[in-house]
Amino acid sequence: MELTPREKDKLLIFTASLLAERRRARGLKLNYPEAVALISAAVMEGARDGKTVAQLMSEGRTVLTRADVMDGIAELIPDIQVEATFPDGTKLVTVHQPIV
């Protein structure tokens, strides 16, 4: 199977988000890469489902709370930018202050 670099990146994000979901389900607080992966995957899947950029920018802020992440992680992530594939093409989605 041949994958483009972009497809490899998407798979890596998806795999990291699965790991983050499992750790979160066990009650563990997420670290920086896990938090970014989980939010990014939620945005990518929402785009695939046909949600708008505005919806995803808003919903991206509800994926995690400060209680879900290790101390100081929320401050390390001021924005998350994700290139997501929508039904009408690829768009950049920016989630500002993703962990409230």
UniProtKB/Swiss-Prot annotation:
Uppermost EC category: hydrolase
GO biological process terms, semicolon-separated: urea catabolic process
GO cellular component, one term: cytoplasm
Enzyme Commission number(s) of this protein: 3.5.1.5
Cell location: Cytoplasm
HAMAP family to which the protein is assigned, alphabetical: Urease_gamma
Assembly mode: Heterotrimer of UreA (gamma), UreB (beta) and UreC (alpha) subunits. Three heterotrimers associate to form the active enzyme.
NCBIfam families xref list: PRK13241.1, urease_gam
Assigned protein family: Belongs to the urease gamma subunit family.
Protein name per the record: Urease subunit gamma
Organism: Polaromonas naphthalenivorans (strain CJ2)
